Amino acid sequence: MVNDIIADSLTRIRNAAMRRLDYTTLYYAKIVVSILEVFLAKGFIESYKVIDKDGKQSINVVLKYDEKGRSVISEIKRISKSGRRVYKGRDELKRFKNGYGTIVVSTSKGVIGNEEAYKANVGGEALCSIW
């Protein structure tokens, strides 16, 4: 059993991108699907699909590469961990990596990117960063 499903999912995506795999499989969790929605909206992944096999759900994530075959994900990192929660206010979420990266934030309005949280005037728990 995995203790931190988000960290496990990010590591699987990172490892698959380094190996230049077409897709990777993640454990299913609603929070992971919400994070993948943000990644998809920001253009860091091609697509994802929830698969139900023998009563167990998993997620297939299709990774995205540029025209030279390099992954569009330069770095993907877990920010808030189970032993140390990290919360960011609205003012700390304005820009990340000059707009090239995204901080995924869990807010009262759901799991959204940092720019959407700034526009919605909300802060929250910083789950992970990607650029």
UniProtKB/Swiss-Prot annotation:
Entry keyword Membrane: no
One GO CC term, this protein: ribonucleoprotein complex
Keyword presence, rRNA-binding: yes
Gene3D superfamilies, per database record: 3.30.1370.30, 3.30.1490.10
Pfam families from the UniProt entry: Ribosomal_S8 (PF00410)
Keywords for this protein: Ribonucleoprotein, Ribosomal protein, RNA-binding, rRNA-binding
A molecular function GO annotation: rRNA binding
GO biological process: translation
Known role: One of the primary rRNA binding proteins, it binds directly to 16S rRNA central domain where it helps coordinate assembly of the platform of the 30S subunit.
Subunit annotation: Part of the 30S ribosomal subunit. Contacts proteins S5 and S12.
Family: Belongs to the universal ribosomal protein uS8 family.
Name of the protein in its database record: Small ribosomal subunit protein uS8
Gene designation per UniProt: rpsH
